[in-house]
C-alpha cells in the first residue's frame, strides 16, 4: 500500500511538473531567461563560416557581417562573404530582413539580399549572454553554414 501511495505521489508530481509552464520550472529570476524581439537591439558583428553543399563540389563560405536589429523584428545589414576564395561582386553587400525571438531565446530570421541567387537566407538562432551574443545556423537546403555574433559596444 505504501508503494502504491509513493508511486501515485511521484506520478502526480511528474504530471504537474510536465504540465507547468517552463518559466515556472526555471531557476532564478524569470526576467533573466525571458526573451523577445526587444532582446535584440543595436549592432552585432557576425563571423560566418561553412559550405554551400548543393553543388558538384562543396563551396567553402567565409565572411563577416554587421547587422542592426531594431528591437521590433526588423534588421538591416552589410556583409562581405567569400565563396571558395572568390570575392563577392559588391564589397559590402546590403540586405534587409525580419526576425522573431521566442520567450525561450530561440528564434528565426529571414535576410533578403537584393539580386542574389542565394536570397532569401533563412536562419535559426539562439540568443545568449543577456542579448549580447547570437548563434545561428542557415536553415535552408544545400547549406552547412553557421555564424556567431557579439553585440558591438556603442559607448566608444
Regions found by a protein language model. Name each.
Residues 9-19:
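Bacterial N-terminal signal peptides
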Residues 21-156:
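Mature soluble binding/inhibitory domains
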Residues 1-11:
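Bacterial N-terminal signal peptides that target proteins for export
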Amino acid at each position: 500500500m505504501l508503494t502504491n501511495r509513493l508511486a501515485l505521489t511521484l506520478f502526480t508530481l511528474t504530471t504537474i511538473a510536465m504540465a507547468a509552464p517552463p518559466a515556472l520550472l526555471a531557476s532564478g529570476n524569470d526576467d533573466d531567461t525571458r526573451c523577445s524581439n526587444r532582446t535584440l537591439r543595436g549592432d552585432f558583428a557576425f563571423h560566418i563560416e561553412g559550405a554551400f553543399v548543393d553543388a558538384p563540389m562543396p563551396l567553402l563560405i567565409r565572411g563577416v557581417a554587421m547587422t542592426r536589429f531594431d528591437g521590433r523584428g526588423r534588421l538591416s545589414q552589410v556583409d562581405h562573404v567569400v565563396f571558395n576564395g572568390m570575392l563577392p561582386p559588391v564589397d559590402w553587400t546590403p540586405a534587409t530582413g525580419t526576425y522573431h525571438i521566442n520567450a525561450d531565446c530561440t528564434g528565426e530570421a529571414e535576410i533578403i539580399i537584393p539580386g542574389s541567387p542565394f536570397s532569401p537566407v533563412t536562419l535559426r538562432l539562439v540568443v545568449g549572454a543577456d542579448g549580447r551574443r547570437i548563434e545561428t545556423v542557415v536553415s535552408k537546403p544545400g547549406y552547412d553554414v553557421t555564424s556567431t555574433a557579439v553585440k558591438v559596444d556603442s559607448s566608444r
